[in-house]
Amino acid sequence: MDSNTVSSFQVDCFLWHVRKRFADQELGDAPFLDRLRRDQKSLKGRGSTLGLDIETATRAGKQIVEQILEEESDEALKMTIASVPASRYLTDMTLDEMSRDWFMLMPKQKVTGSLCIRMDQAIMDKNIILKANFSVIFERLETLILLRAFTEEGAVVGEISPLPSLPGHTNEDVKNAIGVLIGGLKWNDNTVRISETLQRFAWRSSHENGRPSFPPKQKRKMERTIEPEV
């Protein structure tokens, strides 16, 4: 096993522990707590894959971090912070919408890359909107936290979420997953729209009519299913 893989896991475990202690003091905001829960699942998956104990890895990670901090000057820390681009957390959904329970009459599930897509194919003749909570860096979608499909009545009929055991996904992964979700929901005469926020940061360039600029193959599959957010 590569030593960098092990040490990276150890440091991630310790930093998660520090963030958890911070959250236990009720100091974390909603985006912070979202990432904390997501990263916990990711660490469990990585630990299982690597065959490493999380508690032992956390102790080793603490030693690595302490050694780095002993060698770190205040000036070097300032330069490092200044060179790292800051990401922003954007929310289409409220906490209620993110945690809302839902069930599927005709369930369908598909995994594409590190993203899991779920939808209810029993939905008919509905106007559906896709909303997402995600982080943005350099004005592009960086990490998807959760995407859900809602009817006008507020019912959840579809979802895209990262797989805890397969961390990491790209902007293109998210767009491809959205294409799969829309393709599944378009049956039974449903109309699917993507929120303005998601359009803006997942697809930086748009057509004149406001529709996202899809790749040619994806565009052919979706051109009759997407309407811009009003």
From Swiss-Prot:
Q: Which UniProt keywords apply?
A: Eukaryotic host gene expression shutoff by virus, Host cytoplasm, Host gene expression shutoff by virus, Host mRNA suppression by virus, Host nucleus, Host-virus interaction, Inhibition of host innate immune response by virus, Inhibition of host interferon signaling pathway by virus, Inhibition of host PKR by virus, Inhibition of host pre-mRNA processing by virus, Inhibition of host RIG-I by virus, Inhibition of host RLR pathway by virus, Interferon antiviral system evasion, RNA-binding, Ubl conjugation, Viral immunoevasion
Query: Where are the annotated segments for Disordered?
Result: 205-230
Q: Which InterPro entries match?
A: NS1, NS1A, NS1A_effect_dom-like_sf, uS15_NS1_RNA-bd_sf
The record's section on Pfam families has: Flu_NS1
Similarity annotation: Belongs to the influenza A viruses NS1 family.
List the Gene3D superfamilies. Answer: Influenza virus non-structural protein, effector domain, S15/NS1, RNA-binding
By what name is this protein known? Answer: Non-structural protein 1
Q: Where is this region: RNA-binding and homodimerization?
A: 1-73
Entry's Gene Ontology molecular function annotations: protein serine/threonine kinase inhibitor activity; RNA binding
- List where the motif Nuclear localization signal lies: 34-38
Asked if the keyword Membrane belongs to this entry, the reply reads no
Chain positions covered by the region annotation CPSF4-binding: 180-215
Please report the PTM annotation for this entry. Upon interferon induction, ISGylated via host HERC5; this results in the impairment of NS1 interaction with RNA targets due to its inability to form homodimers and to interact with host EIF2AK2/PKR.
UniProt free text on domains: The dsRNA-binding region is required for suppression of RNA silencing.
What is the gene name?
Answer: NS
GO process annotations (BP): symbiont-mediated suppression of host cytoplasmic pattern recognition receptor signaling pathway via inhibition of RIG-I activity; symbiont-mediated suppression of host gene expression; symbiont-mediated suppression of host mRNA processing; symbiont-mediated suppression of host PKR/eIFalpha signaling; symbiont-mediated suppression of host type I interferon-mediated signaling pathway
- Which parts of this chain are annotated as the region PABPN1-binding? 223-230
Which segments cross the bilayer? none
What is the role of this chain?
Inhibits post-transcriptional processing of cellular pre-mRNA, by binding and inhibiting two cellular proteins that are required for the 3'-end processing of cellular pre-mRNAs: the 30 kDa cleavage and polyadenylation specificity factor/CPSF4 and the poly(A)-binding protein 2/PABPN1. In turn, unprocessed 3' end pre-mRNAs accumulate in the host nucleus and are no longer exported to the cytoplasm. Cellular protein synthesis is thereby shut off very early after virus infection.
Q: Which residue positions does the secretion signal occupy?
A: none
